[in-house]
Amino acid sequence: MIFIDACFKKPTPYTPIWMMRQAGRYLPEYMEVRKQAGDFLSLCKDYKKASEVSLQPIDILDVDAAIIFSDILVVPLEMGMNLRFEKGEGPVFDNPISTLEDLEKLDDQNAHKKLNYVYDALKLTREKLSQNKALIGFCGSPWTIATYMIEGSGSKNYAKCKKMLYQNPELLHKILNKLTQVLKLYLEEQIKAGANAIQIFDSWASALEYDKFFEFSFNYMLEISNFIKSKYPNIPVILFPKGISGYLDRIDGNFDVFGVDWSTPLDLARDKLSHKYTLQGNMEPCRLYDKNAIKEGVEKILKTMQNKAHIFNLGHGILPDIPVENAKYFIKLVQESSAK
């Protein structure tokens, strides 16, 4: 698998590519399946449909890896939190956590056993996927998941989380630790079900100041990665903490790929990290609106990463109104332009 080879810094015939949110709303085929499922959460829980949409970008765009269709918040859902998705508002928890009592009500022993719909989707997808295409399993970072559990929804300033961080850091650490233990088991089950690689999404890393990022987010991601790498050394682990270009000097640990978001200069990440890790990223997703912008972005990134281990990706998820033609052009251009 070219994607796995790149994760481990092995030579590849061209730069492998996939896109975050590649199974998504920009594809009419995805919208059709989502309509059949009824709503987003029902689609996540219907393993056959989740598998179908996971495979669509492979069939339509010929990306080098599929990522399983799911959501980072199915974990707190199966721990006992009441999750719903509101149109225009995103995910909402009706019972956010603010006390130790709230936390103790959550089931961390059985949550990973209730996520069979994710494992079934992985099994089915791996069966249908051609042998040269990788299948990526994933989870959110403990910090990013915790922000939703504490705020009750998405947030602009993370005031409830940060209030807890400064007033009651012990409680926040307990929440993060509980999540970390569940996520280890969850990812292990994903690997057993057929995931060839694991990505940990830390979407809200940039909400934390320098020292607090390492204490409350990065260290927990490393604990998960250490667990996976000690048991499954052949499974690459990708970390994607978004928006922390000023923190790169302290990034170190036992993982394989570092995801670079579009706001981080790729040459900066290359100079600081490419001796240790394969880099993944980092094209600005809005470049996909225009073919000239795509071409310019692809050329610049390939030049920056010349002779370095690299997986091409966007620097965040693909947007819902990107023309499919442009996405196809992007994938093909990367694969052809980078061919050795």
Curated annotation (Swiss-Prot):
It catalyses: uroporphyrinogen III + 4 H(+) = coproporphyrinogen III + 4 CO2. Keywords: Cytoplasm, Decarboxylase, Lyase, Porphyrin biosynthesis. GO terms for cellular component: cytosol. Its main location: cytoplasm. One of its GO terms (molecular function) is uroporphyrinogen decarboxylase activity. Substrate binds at R21, Q22, A23, G24, R25, D71, Y148, S203, H316. PANTHER family: METHYLTETRAHYDROFOLATE:HOMOCYSTEINE METHYLTRANSFERASE RELATED, UROPORPHYRINOGEN DECARBOXYLASE. Belongs to the uroporphyrinogen decarboxylase family. This is Uroporphyrinogen decarboxylase. It comes from Campylobacter jejuni subsp. jejuni serotype O:6 (strain 81116 / NCTC 11828).
